[in-house]
Regions:
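Autoinhibitory propeptides
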Residues: 1-40, 47-62, 421
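Active-site core segment of subtilase-fold serine proteases
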Residues: 48-123, 267-378, 382
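Active-site alpha-helical elements of protease catalytic centers
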Residues: 83-142, 151-156, 405, 489-509
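Catalytic-core environment of secreted peptidases
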Residues: 87-116, 313-318, 383, 417-427, ...
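Hydrolase catalytic cores
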Residues: 126-130, 142-154, 158-171, 230-232, ...
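C-terminal subdomain of the subtilisin-like protease fold in secreted/lumenal serine endopeptidases
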Residues: 166-186, 204-213, 217-220, 224, ...
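Surface-exposed, proline-anchored Ser/Thr-rich loop/turn motifs
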Residues: 563-587, 595-601, 618-620, 637-640
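Short, surface-exposed loop/turn motifs with a glycine/proline- and acidic-biased composition
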Residues: 606-633, 639
């Protein structure tokens, strides 16, 4: 999560980049204006400032569109039904505060005591999705101020879904949060809990999740072939924690060891000098740590402990082919990066060595969170930091860096593009946006990259997320000059792209209130935009842009029928779907055309000719069928 300074509101560029104006105004061929009316947007985040003008009713400024808020931190109020912690507040209480019926009767409702999410994140996210100047300005909001524990996030999802079910309304839930600490194949205890909650209401419920901001952090190591000759890389920090996904067939065939080096570390220059080896563990396998945790004390020449290496392997999760394996190094250093000058004494360098057969994937867990006094880093060039040169060095990279829950199969994963590279303040002075590196419309290079360990493309779709100006609480105490009473802030990240997508989904659910996640995903991915920037990383779909850029007007105005078993008023039957070999079409038609989701014509067949999909790669395709009554379309999924 990245934060910027207060500036004037300039959200209109996100609306322009996502082509939402035509949907909000009902421009032809759209049958009416769609604004998110009667749709609920769930914001599971740091909370929301209920007094902000962005969340009022556009026709009555005394009315608030926030139906309820569950603060999981607050134990002063009434607990919500079905949950044993936190406090719940309601629309009437918010309106009483807004209109002066009560005064300061409620606690601050956009608040995170851990500082992990900062202050204002939830309000900003909610403004993008459902503010009066946001994507769905008439949607209602249910917010959760979450404690960041995985189980609490799942509880928050259930809270929103339960409320929407009781009210009989469709809902889209925004998750601008996540973690790298998982198997990256969509399995695990939390993934299963998440799946069970989402499946409680399959119709009219969609979850959008941010792909994460680790796309240029070099946090992934692995996915290369192993042999009896060791390969190695370097890490340093306090602590160093690597999470591995290792196939169940390889947990006794891959071995690891750790080498320690000590010397002088310059935090400001990020370099080591005078390094000497001070410790080396024995080789150990993940299987050997299933029953008994591995622990090794790395000692300096004087006998003092320099670092403690620990390793543990969990049992295989149901539905996964991988084991969750962790190597953690407690460097025993004296660090506090919150003070000035920063204190980073006793930092050592560690080399992770690996040999065996097959492949593995691993992720360096980041601890450089807002308010944290620690850090962890990978090494892409040993010579740049003063590390020993080795011929078997393998640098970490940026693939496989999408976070959970975005990589869960029950979500739509959202990456970020550049919304603006500069802005004008209230005096008309132009400033470069804080994180701007690339032109408007190009990829936000921090966006987490795919694929997943089980081979799925990530992210799935991209929306504006770098340098977005939107709502912030009036009590926000961040850096920068406050304008408009301090109620707008510039932020960057996939956290900002995700609510743009969630707001777009709210417009879709207003039109199709019983649409399923699969139907929503298919329509959005089949109607993305491809341009000169998406071409930078090859043909779509790919693991940088997914299926392309969000264009909600294209989705609403030209969306493809989502009854794929029949086309054109039940005149043409198409089966099977998904298909692996021959596709059957029954009925009176003249011609079939197969298109990629980017609109490229791939094949043409006349009636009576066999349409074989056996040679097509797995993925989504568009089938257009010419009949005497007209031309109709359907989505076809190829799955071998």
């Amino acid at each position: 999560i990245e934060f910027g300074g207060y500036q004037s509101a300039a959200f209109d560029s996100v609306r322009r980049h996502t082509n939402v104006h035509g949907v909000l105004k009902g421009w032809g061929p759209i049958d009416q204006a769609y604004t998110g009316k009667d749709v609920i947007i769930g914001i599971i985040d740091t909370g929301i400032d209920y007094e902000h003008n962005e969340f009022r009713d556009k026709s009555d400024n005394t009315k608030c569109r926030i139906l309820s808020l569950w603060s999981q931190w607050d134990e002063e109020g009434t607990k919500p039904d079905s949950f044993s912690y936190g406090s719940e507040y309601f629309k009437q209480q918010f309106e009483d505060e807004i209109n002066g019926v009560t005064q300061d009767a409620l606690p601050i409702t956009d608040y995170d005591p851990t500082k992990r999410g900062g202050q204002s994140h939830g309000t900003h996210v909610a403004g993008i999705a459902a503010g009066l100047n946001g994507m769905a300005p008439e949607a209602d909001i249910i917010a959760v101020s979450v404690t960041w524990e995985s189980a609490a996030i799942v509880d928050g999802i259930k809270y929103v879904i339960d409320k929407a079910r009781i009210l009989g309304r469709p809902c889209v839930i925004n998750l601008s949060l996540g973690t790298l600490d998982n198997l990256h194949d969509g399995t695990g205890t939390i993934a299963e809990a998440y799946r069970e909650v989402v499946n409680l209401r399959p119709e009219g419920t969609v979850i959008c999740a941010a792909a994460g901001n680790s796309g240029r952090s070099n946090i992934h190591w692995g996915n290369f072939d192993l042999s009896s000759e060791p390969r190695a890389t370097y890490f340093y920090g306090e602590p160093v924690r690597l999470v591995f996904a290792i196939s169940d067939t390889l947990i006794d065939k891959i071995s690891f060891s750790v080498t320690g080096f000590t010397g002088d570390f310059d935090y400001d220059k990020d370099t080591f000098s005078n390094l000497q080896q001070f410790g080396l563990t024995n080789w150990f396998t993940p299987k050997s740590t299933l029953a008994v945790d591995f622990e090794h004390y790395m000692r300096y020449g004087n006998g003092n402990v320099g670092g403690i290496v620990k390793a543990v392997c969990d049992s295989q999760y149901e539905g996964s082919r991988h084991h969750y394996f962790v190597i953690e190094i407690d460097d025993n250093a004296d660090i506090d990066l919150r003070q000035r000058p920063r204190k980073a004494n006793g930092i050592d360098l560690y080399r992770i060595n690996v040999k065996g057969e097959g492949r593995f994937n691993s992720w360096l867990m980041p601890v450089s969170l807002i308010g944290s006094g620690s850090f962890s880093r990978s090494v892409t060039d040993p010579s740049a930091i003063g590390a020993p040169q080795i011929s078997n060095f393998v640098a970490p990279g940026n693939e496989f860096s999408v976070i959970a829950p975005a990589l869960f199969k029950e979500t739509i994963s959202v990456g970020a593009s550049v919304n603006r590279w500069a802005y004008f303040d209230t005096d008309g002075k132009q400033h470069p946006a804080r994180w701007a590196r690339n032109p408007n419309g190009s990829l936000g290079t921090f966006t987490g990259q795919g694929p997943t360990v089980d081979g799925r493309i990530m992210p799935e779709i991209v929306a504006p997320g770098e340098n977005v100006f939107c709502a912030a609480p009036s009590y926000y105490d961040g850096w920068g000059a406050k304008v408009y009473n301090g109620k707008y802030v510039n932020s960057s990240g996939t956290s900002m792209a995700c609510p743009a997508m969630a707001g777009a989904v709210a417009l879709y659910l207003e039109k199709y209130p019983k649409a399923t996640l699969t139907e929503v995903r298919d329509d959005f991915l089949a109607n993305t935009v491809e341009d000169e920037y998406t071409d930078d990383y090859g043909d779509l779909p790919n693991n940088r842009w997914g299926y392309g850029k969000l264009d909600i007007y294209k989705v609403i105005s030209g969306g493809i029928f989502y009854g794929t078993s029949a086309i054109g008023n039940d005149q043409i039957a198409v089966y099977p779907n998904p298909v692996s070999a021959n596709l059957n079409l029954d009925g009176n038609y003249q011609k079939i055309e197969v298109y990629s989701v980017q609109g490229q014509l791939l094949e043409v067949r006349n009636q009576g000719e066999v349409l074989s999909m056996a040679s097509y790669p797995n993925g989504l395709y568009v089938l257009r069928v010419e009949t005497p009554e007209g031309t109709f379309s359907a989505r076809i999924t190829v799955s071998h």
